[in-house]
Regions:
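Catalytic Walker B motif of ABC-type/P-loop ATPase nucleotide-binding domains
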Residues: 161-164
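Conserved ABC transporter NBD signature motif
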Residues: 63-71, 80
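Conserved ABC ATPase "signature" region
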Residues: 114-132
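Helix-to-loop junction immediately C-terminal to a conserved catalytic motif
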Residues: 55
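The feature captures the beta-strand-to-loop junction immediately N-terminal to the Walker
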Residues: 40-42
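Conserved ABC ATPase signature
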Residues: 136-140
């Protein structure tokens, strides 16, 4: 049974002109336990909206979203946060306290999680933040902010972790570091979904790629099925990553690895 099911979901935003802008119109999508999924598509395709719907920050206008077979329509974000966590594109939005330690501990404290102090120590060590634990997260480097935001995101042991543009605005070395971290998440969370424009990250990391365009899923498949289909790429205006093109040229798939 899928972790999450979108059933005929529609949602619209009220524009500055006062009219409704339809983001999704009858969206159907299933997310299965244990998957590593990448959402791709042009700006405005609905990637961030889909994630906000999953964590309850937005509610569908029509249709429903099921979590483990149960409707989430009447559930609050706080109720869903034990199962699904969203790490924002801008890590600064994850920092609400004056130290990383306090930020990581906060969600556990307000929910009376047992052994929250030990869990905080564990996450600080796991994401190499122990020496930075008393620092204000907003004053860290880009890579340190990313690691801290991931630690906050997994504090409640969510079964599903959503990451919005996890490698945006990072230098090459920091980007590689975050990619290694994403690859090594199996013991922390079962299912990971990213929304990204980083096609190399998609090629190297994702098992499944969902392509969004104008509020619809226009393609859903493996790396080879998506990046090897020029019609799909043209539809959403993206180019296959160089690493995939090299693999095709050499008739080898070893360049795209998990």
């Amino acid at each position: 049974e899928p972790n999450v099911q979108f059933r005929d979901v529609s949602i619209a935003y009220r524009s500055v002109k006062g009219d409704d802008r339809l983001v999704f119109d009858g969206l159907d999508l299933e997310i299965r336990r244990g998957e590593k999924i990448a959402l791709i598509g042009s700006n405005g395709a609905g990637k961030s909206t889909l994630m906000k719907l999953m964590v309850g920050l937005l509610k569908p206008g029509t249709g429903d979203i099921l979590l483990n077979g149960e409707s989430t329509r009447k559930k609050k974000t706080e109720q869903l946060s034990k199962s699904i966590s969203l790490v924002y594109q801008n890590p600064e939005e994850m920092f609400i306290k004056d130290s990383i330690r306090a930020d990581i501990a906060y969600a556990m404290q307000v929910r009376d999680v047992e052994n929250w102090q030990a869990r905080t120590d564990e996450l600080l060590a796991r994401f190499r933040l122990t020496e930075l634990q008393d620092r204000d997260g907003r004053l860290l480097s880009g890579g340190q902010m990313r690691r801290a935001s991931l630690a906050i995101g997994v504090a409640l042991n969510p079964g599903i972790l959503l990451l919005d543009e996890p490698t945006a605005n990072l230098d090459i070395a920091t980007r590689k570091e975050i990619m290694r971290t994403l690859t090594d998440m199996k013991d922390i969370t079962e299912t990971v979904m990213i929304a990204t424009h980083d096609m190399q990250l998609v090629c190297e990391w994702a098992q499944r790629i969902v392509v969004l365009c104008r509020g619809r899923v226009v393609a859903d498949g493996t790396r080879d099925e998506i990046f090897g289909n020029q019609e799909i790429l043209d539809t959403v205006g993206i180019r296959p990553p160089e690493i995939f093109s090299m693999g095709q040229a050499l008739d080898s798939r070893a360049f795209c690895y998990t």
